[in-house]
Amino acid sequence: LHGRYADLQDGQVADYIPELAKADPDWFGICIATRDGHVYEVGDTRQVFTIQSISKALSYGLALEDRGEDFILSRVGVEPSGEAFNAISLKPETGAPFNPMINAGAIATCGQILEPSDQTRIQRILDYLSACAGRRLDVDAAVYQSESETGHRNRAIGWMLRNFGILNEEPTEVLETYFQQCAIRVTCRDLAVMGATLANQGRNPLTRELAVNPEVVDNVLSVMSTCGMYDFSGEWIYRVGLPAKSGVGGGILAVLPGQLGIGIFSPPLDAQGNSARGIKVCGDLSRDLALHQFANGSAPTPSLRLSYTGSQVTSCRRRPLTIQQTLRASGHRIRVHELQGELIF
């Protein structure tokens, strides 16, 4: 796959944030991390870039943990908007953003994260994302400064949220935290491990640390499924069928729940703001490996090969005489099932 799309010239590197325009359009990495801790990677998987909007999915999880589902749903919806990620639009009846994956929803979400006396919000967000990645992450100061200096549209969104009471404080500090959150430095490998952490019900498969509360993982993956790929989300779930989140830094994080996480990095973006190579790679992976969540697959075959009692077989292991006597006397109470194939419950 890497060789297939390395020469693809589609897309343009984001330039509305000056620091992002410095990215090399030839950078290209693919990484898959499984829930049991195996990592497979090719290309520029250790090249550092900024996480951008991919951070929205995980900060949403942190806000859910802090405030609870009912409170967050009263401030941020979960409906696809069908609009651009930076649209200045809120629900007319409530003033709430449509979902946490667009800028308005992410800024509102950021403002709900608790800030204890001994930690700032960005420190808590960094701790959370670092636990998901399995290593200590930091903020790219130059990108943060660039985002802050050009973030006039996001400031307009912030003041609208304050006007409707979605933010209960002046938006200036919340916005600076949001700009820093988007400027967190990651690699393609980090994204894959983050995805595998979500696939593994919140437990990082490399460090074994419980990074995300399992109670919010399904909520995060659900919103990623319906809203994670900007205004391409409908076609994405139709063709690829995986919860995912993209960022204008060129990253894509995708998750096959219960199985694996996928991280892709390639800076040139398509018209919707998604990595052009990343979209192609994910489509091929989904098709070639049958990863689509809603694919029926082939007709299931019976998984039960044999069924018998313990009295019908003898143990190959050398055991003390007393245990042998117990097994002979009680073998009929042991049921052995030999299974092979896919188990569907």
Identify what each model region corresponds to:
Residues 1-3, 8-10, 63-181, 189, ...:
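Active-site-adjacent helix/loop patches that line small-molecule binding or acyl-intermediate pockets
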Residues 5-42, 253-254:
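A short, well-structured edge-of-sheet supersecondary motif
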Residues 20-23, 98-99, 149, 183, ...:
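Short Gly/Pro-enriched turn/cap motifs at secondary-structure boundaries
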Residues 36-37, 50-72, 194, 262:
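Active-site SXXK
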Residues 46-48:
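A short acidic/small-residue loop/turn micro-motif
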Residues 57, 185-204, 219, 256-267:
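Active-site-proximal alpha-helical segments within enzyme catalytic domains
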Residues 206-279, 284, 288-314:
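Conserved SxxK-family serine transpeptidase/carboxypeptidase catalytic domain
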Residues 292-345:
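The feature marks cytosolic C-terminal regulatory regions of anion transporters and related permeases
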